[in-house]
From Swiss-Prot:
Annotated function: Aquaporins facilitate the transport of water and small neutral solutes across cell membranes.
Organism: Arabidopsis thaliana (Mouse-ear cress)
Assembly notes: Interacts with cucumber mosaic virus (CMV) Protein 1a.
Cross-referenced NCBIfam families: MIP (TIGR00861)
Vacuolar topology ranges: 46-53, 123-133, 190-210
Cytoplasmic topology ranges: 1-24, 75-101, 155-168, 232-250
GO molecular function terms attached to this record: channel activity
Motif NPA 2 in this chain: 197-199
Localisation per UniProt entry: Vacuole membrane
Name of the protein in question: Probable aquaporin TIP2-2
Tissue expression per record: Expressed above groung and in roots.
Gene3D superfamilies: Glycerol uptake facilitator protein (1.20.1080.10)
Chain positions of motif NPA 1: 83-85
TM annotation in the entry: 25-45, 54-74, 102-122, 134-154, 169-189, 211-231
Length: 250
């Protein structure tokens, strides 16, 4: 059963919530700066050559490391979402209210935009690369690819961070989340770009002015995140029986 809670505006503007929004903004900014920056660096070093296997690995590793750090520095304040798809997936499982989640989205998208503006400034006007499906592939293939890889990401978030039975797994959650993002970029990068994150794609689209395929990177990740939240948050966690408070023995 879906456990979505709307919440209240008052709760969403509490001091703790405002701190969470700022945390999401900063962490997303740092993540996108490093992630998009790695793609810019590759283009600079190769004179805008096409992405080769070594470049793909470098970009994947940069995103994995940056997300590991971003989740780690925000986890104790906001939960370390850094991603509207993660926020939606957690909302479907009742881990965050819709209103608060909406403000998370705003903070994440603003962080991404500011990161890309900073990159343009510090690189003296270099063009920010945007996500797009590879030549020969259609939008539907791109959406399905993003659904699958984002499902894997949000499912990992649930298993290592949101599941009340996670135990010691919680200590490796940022590492596992970074690893799955890096692995998914290696798998999906040559085809859809492997975004898994509407905010990660939105910032470059805004700064470059190229919105031609941005809908793919909202629809795919949001559907994938919601499905992961529905399956893990509502089917698995929702089926947990409460632990008994007393035990009786013969």
């Amino acid at each position: 059963m879906v456990k979505i809670e709307i919440g209240s505006v008052g709760d969403s503007f509490s001091v703790a919530s405002l701190k969470a929004y700022l945390s999401e903004f900063i962490a997303t900014l740092l993540f996108v700066f490093a992630g998009v920056g790695s793609a810019l660096a590759f283009a600079k070093l190769t004179s805008d050559a096409a992405l080769d296997p070594a470049g793909l690995v470098a970009v994947a590793v940069a995103h994995a490391f940056a997300l590991f750090v971003g989740v780690s520095i925000a986890a104790n304040i906001s939960g370390g979402h850094l991603n509207p798809a993660v926020t939606l997936g957690l909302a479907v499982g009742g881990n965050i209210t819709v209103i608060t989640g909406f403000f998370y989205w705003i903070a994440q998208c603003l962080g991404s935009i500011v990161a890309c503006l900073l990159l343009v400034f510090v690189t003296n006007g270099e063009s920010v690369p945007t996500h797009g499906v590879a030549a020969g592939l259609g939008a539907i293939e791109g959406v399905v690819m993003e659904i699958v890889v984002t499902f894997a990401l949000v499912y990992t978030v649930y298993a290592t961070a949101a599941d009340p039975k996670k135990g010691s797994l919680g200590t490796i959650a940022p590492i596992a989340i970074g690893f799955i993002v890096g692995a998914n970029i290696l798998a999906a990068g040559p085809f859809s770009g492997g975004s898994m994150n509407p905010a990660r794609s939105f910032g470059p689209a805004v700064v470059s002015g190229d919105f031609s395929q941005i809908w793919i990177y909202w629809v795919g990740p949001l559907v994938g995140g919601a499905l992961a939240g529905l399956i893990y948050g509502d089917v698995f966690i929702g089926s947990y029986a409460p632990a008994p408070t007393t035990e009786s023995y013969p």
